[in-house]
């Protein structure tokens, strides 16, 4: 089946291979030039902060050492930035982009997808992180395990349809029968966390683990969370050590698992970077090699540590293959996935 190889691609991507060296003439291209990094989100958010950390180091690994300038272009759930990079900007390798995984999944799962950007027709440089969602309650909640959530009402907070806090909660409810009640409309995960602290909610599902650690370090330090489940294509060692079971334990049928994998797969490319198709292949190779080198750069990793952001990359060639497989998913499976996240 087209989607069955995605978990294996992640495991394979954990060992990054060296890129093929581009022709010698390509090394002269970037000298004295500036590369625009278009971010499909507003300034100041977690996605923007991450992109700026990458930008500080990426140019050092591109032959010719071009400058990297971050430009924010929010709108249409990231599709505005994607459209600009893929259809408007010159296809010369001087424009790259960073959009949310939801932007890539939108054409597959949105009820009314934005058709101005086709994520299957760009060249991916890689993803800086492969993340994991968590489904958690605060320690005072009566629901302390997933087994308890199967039999008693548990109130979870969400932001909006299309956001993981809504979609993952609905997916879990649909696929496992968990008695989750979703209250939606919060402005962000910090607002959800505040509502949990006020006692309005039991917890949240679909919270990115990396974001949770940076947004609520006090909860982590004081062990205030009950980890009902971790949601990802591969287990997260840190979460496993904290006792968080994989959601797949509670999704029994093969059919349900295949549907759930489509939705969960976006965690495999949490911080994707790309350029337009049509950029000369040798420049794409250079950008991919530079991205891989940045992910291994000791100074970048130190900066990431100070910022509290996780780095768990996959190279561009494997991200490309993963997204091609996703876009080959049978329509019937996609329709089931849509119904699961928006019941």
What is each residue range found by the language model?
Residues 37-51, 75-77, 157-164:
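Extracytoplasmic "Venus flytrap"
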Residues 5-19:
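Bacterial N-terminal signal peptides
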Residues 32-35, 221-228, 250-252, 258, ...:
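An extracytoplasmic/periplasmic, membrane-proximal ligand-sensing/linker region
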Residues 101-113, 166, 170-175, 198, ...:
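A ligand-binding cleft/hinge motif common to bilobed small-molecule-binding domains
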Residues 20-26:
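Sec/Tat signal peptide C-region and signal peptidase I cleavage site
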Residues 29, 35, 60-62, 84-95, ...:
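Hinge/capping helix and adjacent helix->loop/strand transition within the periplasmic-binding protein
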Residues 98-99, 159, 185, 205-207, ...:
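Short beta-strand and adjacent tight-turn residues that come in two discontinuous sequence segments
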């Amino acid at each position: 089946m087209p989607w069955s190889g995605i978990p294996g691609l992640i495991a394979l991507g954990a060992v990054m291979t060296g890129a093929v060296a581009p022709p010698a003439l390509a090394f002269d291209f970037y000298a004295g030039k500036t590369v625009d990094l278009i971010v499909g989100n507003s300034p100041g958010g977690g996605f923007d902060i991450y992109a700026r950390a990458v930008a500080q180091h990426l140019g050092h690994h591109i032959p010719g050492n071009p400058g990297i300038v971050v430009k924010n272009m929010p709108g249409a759930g990231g599709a505005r930035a994607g459209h600009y990079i893929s259809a408007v900007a010159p296809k010369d390798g001087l424009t790259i982009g960073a959009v949310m995984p939801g932007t890539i999944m939108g054409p597959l799962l949105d009820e009314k997808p934005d058709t101005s950007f086709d994520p299957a027709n760009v060249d991916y440089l890689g993803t800086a992180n492969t993340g994991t969602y968590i489904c958690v309650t605060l320690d005072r909640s009566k629901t302390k395990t997933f087994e308890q959530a199967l039999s008693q009402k548990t109130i979870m907070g969400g932001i909006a349809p299309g956001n993981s806090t809504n979609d993952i909660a609905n997916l879990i409810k649909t696929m496992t029968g968990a008695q989750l009640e979703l209250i939606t409309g919060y402005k962000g995960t910090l607002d959800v966390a505040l509502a949990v602290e006020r006692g309005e909610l039991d917890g949240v599902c679909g919270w990115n683990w990396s974001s949770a650690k940076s947004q609520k370090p006090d909860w982590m330090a004081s062990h205030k969370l009950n980890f009902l489940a971790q949601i990802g294509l591969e287990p997260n060692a840190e979460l496993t050590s904290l006792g968080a079971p994989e959601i797949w334990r509670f999704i029994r049928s093969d059919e349900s698992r295949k549907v759930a994998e489509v939705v969960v797969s976006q965690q495999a490319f949490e911080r994707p970077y790309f350029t337009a198709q049509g950029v000369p292949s040798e420049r794409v190779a250079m950008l991919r090699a530079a991205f891989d080198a940045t992910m291994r750069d000791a100074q970048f990793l130190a900066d990431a540590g100070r910022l509290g952001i996780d780095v768990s990359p996959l190279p561009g060639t494997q991200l490309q293959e993963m997204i091609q497989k996703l876009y080959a998913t049978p329509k019937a499976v996609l329709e089931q996935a849509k119904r699961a996240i928006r019941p």
